[in-house]
Amino acid sequence: MPTKTKKRSVLEAERKKIGLDHAPKEDESVDDNFPKQFKRLLQQKEYHESKKKEIKKGNLKNKKKKDYGKIQRLPGERLSEFSQRVNKAIPVSFKSGPSKIDEFTDKKEKKKIAKRKEKRERDWNEIEENFEDKTWEADTTGQFIQIESRKKRKNSPDPWANLQTKPSFGETVQAPPELPELKIKETKYLENVPKVNNMGQTESMARRQALGKQRLELIEKYRELMKTKRK
């Protein structure tokens, strides 16, 4: 098969005709080599920059708003068609500013929250109506009657407040501190008192203590009777 490549002499002659690949001159147009999308971006950039300059100078005029006029219903026109025409004529306006949480909550949850608030207010109103006025005695007799308030209870006094005072220089202790006697309740262990009753139900501690007391009382009475019989 004959070779399809050109001879060396032919290739060198073609290169001499083309010449060297120099950079394009200022007069030559290079726009044809750019892609169209890149050209659009350049045009947009130039447009925005020119607009900013005009705004700074104050040459840019505000656009006049369209005067829609009064929209009236045409004779023989349906209400649905008229409403569509009105919606098209009215410009769409979006809310500015941060969105609220209530806009995204479900309608059912909103109703539940509203019902709870109403019930709470109703209960408070009933309590206030049923609340007896106890101030009439204070008005007539002049005696102060303490009424329960919703204020928080005051804090109890600090038992270690005395330790905060620093001793003076050269102070000596005359006697050891006297500690108050602690009232310790004697723990009574209940013996022979079952934890479960005849029905198989567990008994509480208070119930078992009461049964233990009754058992001891009966034992003492029985012993007294036996002593009297022996005599």
Curated annotation (Swiss-Prot):
Keyword S-adenosyl-L-methionine among UniProt keywords: no
Q: What's in the GO CC field?
A: nucleolus; nucleus
Tell me the InterPro entries matching this sequence. Answer: C607.02c-like
Q: Where is the composition biased (Basic and acidic residues)?
A: 9-27
Q: Which UniProt keywords apply?
A: Nucleus
Q: What are the subcellular locations of this protein?
A: Nucleus, Nucleolus
User: What name goes with this protein?
Assistant: UPF0653 protein C607.02c
